[in-house]
Amino acid sequence: MYTYYNAHPKGLLVGDCVKRAISKAANMDYMEVQRELNRHKKVTGCANYYDHNHGTHYVEHVLHGVKMSFPAVKGKPRMNGERFCKAYPKGHYILSMAGHLSCCIDGVIYDTWDCSDKCVYTAYKVEPETKYFKILKDRDTYCAHVTNDKETYISAYMDKKRMEAYAQCLKDLGFKEREELLT
């Protein structure tokens, strides 16, 4: 199963499969992924953040993706995107194909083109970044306690009407509201 997905902020079709796959599978912002890959290329020594090998190194060592290899077996068809989706219908995966990275979430490949017939050599199971918020009230003023897996932020204080709009924006961006406060 394939669904069109283009995370590029300007909607451009460019060679950004590494950023697309990571941003979708890990539930990260596209530009945040670009910044992270730029920082990480100092570790790998790659010239470009969009290098396929650099991307898989980042997935394995920074996102702690669990590596699954699919070697060729004589007399049997190779694993491809379509067979992978059927074999692994649940979870977030980054698929390493010949010169390409793609994303599979719950049995659906998300990419700018249908690569489901390409051989999958390696897949990485990743846990998506979880983003939460909690609205706090202090007399007539509200603030949002916003967190992801790495950092915690406190938004500016605002009145109830603005906070309701802000909370809706957070929900639209994929944040989940929590009952308890995270520390």
Language-model segments: residues:
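Active-site nucleophile-adjacent alpha helix/oxyanion-hole segment immediately C-terminal to the catalytic cysteine
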Residues: 1-47
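Conserved active-site-adjacent core of cysteine acyl-enzyme catalytic domains
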Residues: 41-99, 105-114
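Generic beta-strand structural signal
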Residues: 104-105, 137
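Noncatalytic regulatory segments and standalone regulatory/sensor domains
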Residues: 111-131
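Short aromatic-glycine-(Arg/Gly/Cys) micro-motifs in beta-strand/loop hairpins
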Residues: 133-152
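A short, exposed loop/beta-hairpin motif centered on an aromatic-Gly-Thr core
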Residues: 149-162
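Short, mixed-charge low-complexity intrinsically disordered segments
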Residues: 172-183
